């Protein structure tokens, strides 16, 4: 093998090692997004909830600013309980559900982590659908300290 080939091979190996440290996107968020659309019948895009209030989106702090933000805090707390009491990884837990006439419904045959996380998401999606959406509470993280 020529020295240039060895350098190329080494570069490929190093880049593959670096890529292995990049975590994949949580699968559960795809299901949660679909549940939200099921519950609100497509009236609001899921992206509207990604940076709303103090708790909708990644992390959360402060006091929820309204009913919708409280739904997000309850969902965050539910995921925390899933991690603590159920020893689940809620962002990675895949579950079975269907979209019924009254919103998302979890598969009754599932137990443990799958059912717990599904219930967290279904409850939140229904809560989102009932809560008013106030545009002035979108992208306000500076008020949530």
UniProtKB/Swiss-Prot annotation:
Protein's name in the database: Basic phospholipase A2 S6-45
EC number annotated for this UniProt entry: 3.1.1.4
Subcellular location, record wording: Secreted
Cofactor: Ca(2+)
Organism: Austrelaps superbus (Lowland copperhead snake)
Domain of life, per lineage: Eukaryota
Signal peptide: 1-19
Gene3D superfamilies: Phospholipase A2 domain
Propeptide residue span(s): 20-27
Family: Belongs to the phospholipase A2 family. Group I subfamily. D49 sub-subfamily.
Keywords tagged on the record: Calcium, Disulfide bond, Hemostasis impairing toxin, Hydrolase, Lipid degradation, Lipid metabolism, Metal-binding, Platelet aggregation inhibiting toxin, Secreted, Signal, Toxin
Top enzyme category: hydrolase
Co-factor remark: Binds 1 Ca(2+) ion.
CDD domains, per the entry: PLA2c
Expression (tissue specificity): Expressed by the venom gland.
GO biological process: arachidonate secretion; lipid catabolic process; phospholipid metabolic process
SMART domains found in the cross-reference section: PA2c
Any one annotated GO CC term: extracellular region
The reaction(s) this protein catalyses: a 1,2-diacyl-sn-glycero-3-phosphocholine + H2O = a 1-acyl-sn-glycero-3-phosphocholine + a fatty acid + H(+)
A molecular-function term among this protein's GO annotations: phospholipid binding
Residues that coordinate or bind Ca(2+): 55, 57, 59, 76
């Amino acid at each position: 093998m020529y020295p240039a080939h060895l350098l190329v091979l080494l570069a490929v190996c190093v880049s593959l090692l670096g890529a292995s440290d990049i975590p994949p996107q949580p699968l559960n968020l795809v299901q949660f997004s679909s549940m939200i659309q099921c519950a609100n019948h497509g009236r609001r895009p899921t992206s509207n909830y990604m940076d709303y209030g103090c708790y909708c989106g990644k992390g959360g702090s402060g006091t929820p600013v309204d009913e919708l933000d409280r739904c997000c805090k309850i969902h965050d707390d539910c995921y925390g309980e899933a991690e603590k009491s159920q020893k689940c990884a809620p962002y990675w837990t895949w579950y079975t559900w269907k979209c019924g006439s009254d919103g998302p419904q979890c598969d009754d045959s599932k137990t443990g982590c799958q059912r717990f996380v599904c219930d967290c998401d279904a409850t939140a999606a229904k809560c989102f659908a009932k809560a008013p959406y106030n545009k002035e509470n979108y992208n306000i993280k500076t008020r949530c300290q």
